[in-house]
């Protein structure tokens, strides 16, 4: 496992889609300067070697034991990919595998901020939302001939409907993907948009 960080903003040249296909993009734009000073702010806790390395490498490694969840992932990803059809942003097998692995590996994290039990649908939708931002939206950039308002609206609709189908209406209110698409659409008025803030 190789873990590293790169600070990306509008002044930095973006990575190629080929590099982004092999990376997990985690956006950390909000800063709470008071957070973590009186107690640790760890929602997941300490992770051991098994959690970090895992046993699964491809979708096939988790599909059999988690068929229902993986089929939910595939239905969602098919809807998103329908919007991406004919663009350089369409996803393929590597992204499909990472979607399945990410969602399945998030299933144990079913406690809310107040230790309440979250439904599996909510946990799956939350993971789909996060990985959509990491693996799909991070690859989208271009001028208004490549990335149009209509394209971003269609993608927003597919994501919103997909998340609602998985968990119900409540998840889309907190959707990081939908918030990012709204931000990207706002940037498009200048004639160009990208994921990077």
Residue ranges and their predicted role:
Residues 1-197:
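C-terminal regulatory/interaction module of P-loop NTP-utilizing enzymes
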């Amino acid at each position: 496992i190789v873990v590293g960080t790169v600070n990306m903003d509008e002044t930095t040249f973006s990575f190629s889609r080929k590099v982004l296909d092999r990376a997990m993009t985690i956006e950390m734009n909000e800063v709470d300067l008071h957070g973590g000073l009186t107690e640790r702010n760890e929602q997941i806790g300490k992770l051991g070697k098994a959690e970090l390395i895992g046993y699964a490498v491809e979708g096939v490694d988790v599909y059999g034991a988690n068929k229902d969840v993986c089929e939910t992932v595939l239905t969602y990803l098919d809807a998103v990919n329908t919007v991406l059809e004919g663009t350089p942003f369409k996803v393929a097998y590597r992204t499909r595998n990472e979607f399945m692995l990410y969602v399945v590996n998030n299933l144990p994290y079913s406690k809310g901020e107040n230790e309440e039990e979250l439904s599996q649908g909510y946990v799956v939708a939350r993971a789909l939302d996060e990985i959509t931002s990491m693996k799909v939206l991070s690859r989208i950039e271009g001028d208004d001939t490549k990335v149009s308002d209509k394209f971003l609206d269609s993608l927003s609709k597919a994501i919103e409907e997909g998340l609602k189908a998985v968990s119900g209406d409540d998840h889309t209110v907190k959707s990081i993907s939908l918030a990012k698409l709204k931000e990207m659409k706002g940037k498009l008025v200048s004639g160009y948009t990208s994921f990077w803030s």
